[in-house]
């Protein structure tokens, strides 16, 4: 996601200074508390947050203090919860669960998981059970901040980006280009099926009805994992809602049983 020129220049200038510090602190294997301090420096110097107005480490959720939280411009409502791990710890999916639970309890939509080297941005999914989607990730030590496009990696977690709704737009783009949405469009959009039917007639001069096309797409073309599960169901419902019709019902054909080889006499 392109960053505005002024913000891009700020990110590049700050990270040219901060990157060697991050690398040095990783070599020293600093503690989690010191990693929190380093992260606050990155967020204030490079990402546009006010260290004193926007960032707090004294926010209690059900009696437990989160590592860091973001309140934009000293507002009372938390906008982002930040889960910090010591710089020497490799980030793992299990690390995000506690932060997502914290966020869900407070109605907070965004969570950042970081060890100062790697940064991951998640969107909380308020469902039963609570879930999360990873929206963006980057490694500060793998980027070359002499190149302008490196700023684009950090921009989505900048204060300016959140205020402009950039992470939400990235999530929308992610959903729009997912295999679930593309599969749902192929199967449930009359316009798409009509276009395929029309082109088939033009190419091979044969009329094929749309239900037959949908059946072929589902059973022979589209991978099964793009058609099953909550993401697939949600995508199909969205296509159905936008097209104003009921979902197309297509029966899945069982996989053909393999025939054992005939033994030779």
Q: How would you name each of these model-derived features?
A:
Residues 112-114:
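Acidic beta-strand-to-loop metal/phosphate-binding motif
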Residues 116-118:
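Short beta-alpha junction loops
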């Amino acid at each position: 996601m392109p960053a505005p020129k002024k913000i891009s220049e700020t990110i590049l200038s700050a990270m040219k200074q901060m990157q060697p510090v991050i690398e040095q602190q990783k070599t020293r294997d600093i503690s989690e508390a010191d990693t929190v301090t380093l992260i606050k420096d990155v967020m204030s110097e490079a990402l546009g947050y006010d260290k004193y107005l926007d960032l707090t480490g004294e926010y209690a959720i059900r009696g437990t203090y989160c590592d860091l939280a973001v309140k934009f411009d000293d507002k009372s409502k938390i906008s982002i919860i930040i889960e910090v791990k010591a710089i020497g710890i490799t980030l793992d999916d299990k690390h995000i669960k506690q932060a997502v639970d914290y966020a869900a309890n407070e109605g907070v939509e965004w969570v950042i998981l970081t060890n100062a080297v790697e940064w991951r941005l998640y969107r909380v999914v308020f469902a039963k059970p609570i879930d999360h989607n990873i929206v963006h990730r980057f490694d500060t030590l793998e980027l070359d901040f002499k190149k302008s496009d490196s700023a684009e990696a950090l921009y989505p977690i900048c204060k300016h980006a959140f205020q402009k709704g950039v992470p939400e737009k990235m999530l929308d783009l992610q959903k729009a280009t997912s295999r679930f949405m593309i599969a749902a469009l192929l199967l449930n959009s009359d316009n798409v099926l009509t276009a395929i039917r029309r082109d088939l007639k033009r190419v091979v001069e044969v009329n094929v009805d749309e239900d037959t096309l949908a059946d072929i797409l589902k059973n022979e073309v589209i991978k099964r994992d793009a058609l099953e599960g909550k993401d697939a169901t949600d995508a199909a419902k969205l296509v159905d809602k936008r097209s104003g019709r009921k979902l197309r019902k297509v029966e899945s054909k069982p996989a053909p049983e393999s025939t054992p080889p005939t033994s030779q006499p």
